[in-house]
Amino acid sequence: GKRPCRGISIVGAGGKTSTMFQLAKEYAGMGKRVIVTTSTHIFRPDGYEVVLKDQPEWLERLMEFTEKPGGNILVTAAEEMDWKKGKNDNFPCDKAKKKLKGMEPHEIGRLLNYCDVLLIEADGSKGLPVKVPAEHEPVIIPETQVVIGCAGLTAIGEMIQEVCFRSEFLERIRKDGKVTEQLL
């Protein structure tokens, strides 16, 4: 039978990935089977089991995960791709890394059958601490029960165009061009 599962989508900017993996550790510490995924892109995390949909053993590995006792974390995505820092990226690393590409929303919803808790990074912000979403964002699956919004407090007092993804929308609101607590 289907296990009860909490679908949690994490959106916004600064701190999404850290928040997602901290929650994963806490839920695993409570004996839950946790799947971590994305509907956009995330860097491939170190120290976690990763299974990709484009691997032939994908479904078999998901089934094995369901049979494990609680307290485990599995990271899954559609595929792995090379990533090099672009001119609009604000990630702290310059070297080439691997990124995981998210699955389609209907595919993510199916992961609920294999876990107790499903954590989804559902937004991208090019590594910046603040984001104004476009009309098609964030990519939240219908099965989401909780949405957590993140923003980096390091942006407070900084110039919007330096710390905000899609800053042009905020610059129209704030004439002095600075990020404030109220703005976040």
Which functions belong to the PLM regions below?
Residues 84, 93-117, 122-184:
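Conserved catalytic-core segment of NTP-binding enzymes
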